[in-house]
Regions:
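N-terminal export signals
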Residues: 17-18, 24-46
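Periplasmic-binding protein-like
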Residues: 119, 123-132, 152-154, 197-200, ...
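Beta-alpha junction/loop-to-helix N-cap segments that form part of ligand/metal-binding clefts
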Residues: 54, 71-78, 91-163, 173, ...
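N-terminal secretory signal peptides
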Residues: 1-24
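Segments of small-molecule ligand-sensing domains
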Residues: 329-344, 348, 355-417, 436
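Extracellular/periplasmic periplasmic-binding protein-like sensory domains
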Residues: 267-348, 361-362, 421-436
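Extracellular/periplasmic Venus flytrap/periplasmic-binding protein
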Residues: 114, 159-160, 167-270, 313-321
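C-terminal segment of N-terminal export signals and the immediately downstream linker at the start
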Residues: 41-64, 68
Length: 437
């Protein structure tokens, strides 16, 4: 895998790397303040002394803080840290504080596997929230199973994680491609055009997302006339893009980070945006990437679970509060001030879902993992400060959440919501078969 990075998006990644490669564990501050990533906020409430003396829960988080996905790892870590700080400020979980152990997977599956093995053995974590690149999530699944540790996925979107390769120990508290495709395909076919060519990142997430959209576009009367995979980290994509042509209506893009920037910018320079409508997964146009694409992303139609705007139905107190706090935290690690994105949101809500499960199960340590799994299966999450994107249910059959989807268009450099699709309109049948307990 390439380790090429987009400098604009990485922001202060080097600073983050310096703070986390020592695998720092969050420690209590007697003064009740926090400094950078190495401390946790405490308030001066009466329970403060008792909370500080209680045995902490150890929460591990594996993130790509260097390498091709570093920009997303930065946002993801902000989401985890934000949730942990809020939990500790409000009294912890079951009267116990939460300590965070951070590991850098360097955007590499082998490094990621070694990192989570160390989290499980040497660091002795109780549970885990994180994972960005799907190939790394898949590589780490056996570690969670071997050590019987609950794993709340932070970002990984590969379809198989909650279908053919599902695990009793792994949960995804946000959407996935089959649900997005079911929500988006009718709009693509009826509002844009019937014939599509799919351009995708040629690894597990891109491939499974390609398959999901191919199926749903066909189910809605459309046609996928071709597909083109581009390896991760390809700086010059023109050799792939220049071969695309023919009679079809739209190019559906499945990329993230610098790869998305390269495909959009280079594809526009080749004239593809004049010939075909650009649409795609929301990862193509996250808020951290928009500046690097400028007006070349104008008119792009995408789908996402979270957008940093307040068009209806997003103008809620919970989303305003989430936005304001996340924005302030992002500015501390990247002075350019990137807006909150889907990666902050999904990691933030994953920690809060885990908190509910720990409270419900009375989890005390890894021996209680079966109780925690049972508490998380079918867990109901209600819209509010902990779940600003709205109500959702964690399905027992496959440990997959379904949630509201937002179809948007990029105009004048920002998002404009065109349609909100309720979670119940995104449901797909479970395709997971857990091994016998």
């Amino acid at each position: 895998m390439s380790n090429g990075e987009n400098g604009h998006n990485l922001g202060n990644a080097a600073h983050l790397h310096a703070n986390v490669t020592r695998r720092r564990v969050l420690r209590w501050s007697a003064a009740g303040g926090a400094v950078g990533l190495g401390a946790t906020l405490l308030s001066s409430k009466p329970w403060r002394a008792a909370l500080a003396d209680a045995k902490p829960y150890k929460l591990g988080t594996e993130q790509p803080l260097t390498g091709v996905a570093a920009y997303g790892g930065k946002s993801s870590l902000v989401g985890v840290q934000m949730a942990v700080d809020r939990i500790n400020k409000s009294g912890g979980i079951n009267g116990r504080p939460v300590e965070l152990v951070v590991a850098d997977d360097q955007s590499k599956p082998d490094t990621g596997r070694r990192a989570v093995e160390k989290l499980a053995t040497e660091d002795g974590i109780d549970f885990h929230v994180g994972g960005f690149l799907s190939n790394i999530c898949l590589a780490c699944t056996p570690v969670w199973e071997e050590h019987k540790i609950v794993n709340m996925i932070g970002v990984c979107l590969d379809t198989t994680l909650t279908t053919s390769k599902c695990s009793r120990y792994t949960f995804r508290t946000f959407d996935f491609a089959p649900a997005q495709a079911k929500a988006f395909a009718p709009y693509l076919v009826r509002q844009i055009g019937k014939k599509w060519h799919i351009l995708y990142a040629d690894y597990s997430w891109g491939q499974s997302t390609r398959d999901a959209y191919t199926a749903e576009i066909k189910a809605n009367g459309g046609e996928v006339v071709g597909s083109t995979g581009i390896p991760l980290g390809t700086a010059d994509t023109t050799s792939f893009l220049s071969k695309i042509g023919g009679d079809f209506d739209g190019l559906f893009l499945i990329f993230f980070g610098s790869d998305a920037i390269n495909v959009v910018n280079q594809g526009t320079d080749l004239g593809l945006a004049k010939k075909y409508k650009f649409a795609g997964d929301g990862a193509v146009a996250t808020s951290t990437q928009l500046p690097a694409m400028g007006n070349k992303i104008e008119g792009f139609v995408g789908i996402d679970r979270y957008l940093p705007v307040f068009d209806a139905p997003l103008d809620t107190p919970e989303l305003h509060s989430f936005f304001d706090e996340a924005l302030g935290r992002l500015k501390k690690v990247d002075p350019s001030g990137p807006l909150p994105d889907r990666y902050v949101q999904s990691n933030f809500e994953a920690v809060n879902a885990l908190k509910l499960g720990v409270e419900k199960s009375g989890f005390q340590g890894r021996n209680d993992t079966p109780k925690l799994i049972e508490a998380l299966e079918g867990l109901t999450m209600k819209a509010g400060p902990d779940f600003p994107t709205g109500d959702k249910v964690l399905r027992k059959d496959d440990h997959q959440v379904f949630m509201r989807e937002l179809i948007y268009v990029i105009k004048d450099g920002t998002y404009h919501v065109q349609q909100a699709v309720s979670w119940d309109q995104t449901l797909v049948p479970p395709a997971c078969h857990f091994p016998a307990a």
